[in-house]
Each structure stands twice: as structure tokens, then as C-alpha cells.
Amino acid sequence: MNSLISNEVYDVESGLRKVIESAKANFCESVDVAINLNINSSKSDEQVRGCVVLPKGLGREIKVAVFAKGGYLEMAREAMADIVGDEELIEEVKKKQCKLDVDWCLTTPDFMASVSSIAKILGPKGLMPNPKFNTVTFELAKAIKMIKSGQIKFKSDKTGIVHAKIGNIKFSIEDLLENFNAVISAVKQCKPASIKGLYFKDVFIISTMGKSVKVENLNN
């Protein structure tokens, strides 16, 4: 976690302004939210993961690769997937002949076994298709459209913190706030059933190189 701008707790809009003001890097810094959850990530039933479509997008193109066969290949191409292929593409990935410079990988249920052969390559990059993220589906066109409209995935880390991008410093405060609220709402919907009391411990907003700010309690 980046150091705090101050020990003050801000309302979300003021916090966003402070983060943007403190971003001094010579590139367009991203703006992220970090949500410290009152969970035990070592327990499988308290792990938090999900997807959310950012209403104002990420401010950049989201790239998608699709592993499939037969007619699903053409479906993926028509839906404007960036990389499309079957077993041949899998072999290229194994041999490092294809650099998967993408944000998401999708496949169909009948092709999942083939994709599993490159799980050790996709997994560490966070690209392994997963039914929980709706990235193992026969409805490829629908999934690709959803992703490219601004869908992101989130997952609690081993310390119980969820990190998610909500845009960059060139976004308007209003657009960042709308994306922020979408992420907060999605994480709340993923609250484990075993958590009966406090769910959000702390919420911070951070830019890539700038300092972070703590924002007001958002448990309600």
C-alpha cells in the first residue's frame, strides 16, 4: 500500500480529488481502489471474487483471447476478439511463439480440457478461464461484448484486500466516482455468508505512483 497523503479520512469525492492532485508521474497514472475486508482468506468460504462492468470503462482498450474450435472460432472473430485460435494456438503458447498480451482469456466448456494444458502459463498471469468469471461459456459473443464494455475481475488477496482499477487520472471525478461505486457495490454483493458483522475494514484510493487516501466507512 502506498503511504497515506494524511491521516485524515475523506469522503469519496474529496479523496479522489486528493489522489489526482498528488499524482505527479510523467505518465498517465491509473486510479485504483483497495478494500481491506474483514475476512480470513485462508478459508475457502471467505474468499471474495467476482466481476463488475465499470460504467465509464477503463479508459483504454480491453484485449481478449479466445481458445475454441469449430464454429466458435468464427463467433469469436465476429465479436472482435483480439486473438483467436484452437489447439494450434495452444501449442504456440506452450512454445512461447505467441505472446498473450491480453486482459482476458475465454474458452468454451468443450474446449476447457485443452486449455488446462497451459494452466501453468495462464494461471500466474490471472488469465486462466474460470466459470466463476463467466470466461468458460458457449455464449462467447455476449461475454466478449461485456468484457470490452469495461468489465474487470476482482479477487481478495492472501491478506484479505481486494484491489481494482477504476480508471486513470485523466477521468473526470464524476466518472471515477461512478466506477468506484460500481466496484463497491459488486464487492458488497460477494460478502461471504459466514461474515455476520463488519465486512469492510478500510477503503483506500490510490494512484500508480502517488500516495493513498483513506475514505469514509462504506459498510452501509
From Swiss-Prot:
One GO molecular-function entry: structural constituent of ribosome
Alphabetic keyword roster: Repressor, Ribonucleoprotein, Ribosomal protein, RNA-binding, rRNA-binding, Translation regulation, tRNA-binding
InterPro entries on file: Ribosom_uL1_bac-type (IPR005878), Ribosomal_uL1 (IPR002143), Ribosomal_uL1-like (IPR023674), Ribosomal_uL1/biogenesis (IPR028364), Ribosomal_uL1_3-a/b-sand (IPR016095), Ribosomal_uL1_CS (IPR023673)
An example Gene Ontology CC term for this record: large ribosomal subunit
Cited Pfam families: Ribosomal_L1
GO biological process, one term: regulation of translation
SUPFAM superfamilies in the record: Ribosomal protein L1
Domain of life (superkingdom): Bacteria
Annotated family: Belongs to the universal ribosomal protein uL1 family.
Functional summary from the UniProt entry: Binds directly to 23S rRNA. The L1 stalk is quite mobile in the ribosome, and is involved in E site tRNA release.
NCBIfam families listed in its UniProt record: rplA_bact
Subunit comment: Part of the 50S ribosomal subunit.
Name recorded for this polypeptide: Large ribosomal subunit protein uL1
Taxonomic placement: Bacteria, Pseudomonadati, Pseudomonadota, Alphaproteobacteria, Rickettsiales
Gene name for this UniProt entry: rplA
